């Protein structure tokens, strides 16, 4: 009897899962949008939402907790300097998961995960950044 039905194992060991979600959380904080499989995106919400809630109150203890979970200094700085203040008046629901169809090779359901209320990027700015 599986009381609670905790988390998706995603066919990985616990250390691999921890490292994968740590890397995905850093990527989401850095780029504010990522493309991944649907089960990973749904499980990543459980990792990233509490981190953004920590980022709303920039105490030293919260910064240390965030660094312990992310292990990336630049991501922690961005979390507390940009992302936390952006969601100061929002109580949860910081991410959006959009279904993107199925991957060509193995037909895995894909998803686009992004932070809500992220700044829009104009096409002209994107072209100048690419050059």
Curated annotation (Swiss-Prot):
Pfam short name (any one): Ribosomal_L17
Molecular function terms from GO: structural constituent of ribosome
GO biological process, one term: translation
Keywords: Ribonucleoprotein, Ribosomal protein
A GO cellular component annotation in the UniProt record: cytosolic large ribosomal subunit
HAMAP family with a match to the protein in the record: Ribosomal_bL17
Subunit (UniProt): Part of the 50S ribosomal subunit. Contacts protein L32.
Similarity section: Belongs to the bacterial ribosomal protein bL17 family.
This protein's name: Large ribosomal subunit protein bL17
């Amino acid at each position: 009897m599986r009381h609670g039905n905790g988390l998706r194992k995603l066919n990985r060991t616990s250390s691999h899962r921890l490292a994968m979600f740590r890397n995905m959380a850093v990527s989401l904080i850095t780029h504010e949008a990522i493309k991944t499989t649907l089960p990973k995106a749904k499980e990543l919400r459980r990792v990233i939402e509490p981190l953004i809630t920590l980022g709303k109150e920039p105490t030293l203890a919260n910064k240390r907790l965030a660094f312990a979970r992310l292990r990336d200094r630049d991501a922690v700085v961005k979390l507390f300097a940009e992302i936390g203040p952006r969601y100061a008046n929002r109580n949860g629901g910081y991410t959006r998961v959009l279904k993107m169809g199925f991957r060509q090779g193995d037909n895995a359901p894909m998803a686009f995960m992004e932070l809500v209320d992220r700044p829009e990027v104009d096409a002209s700015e994107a072209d100048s950044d690419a050059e």
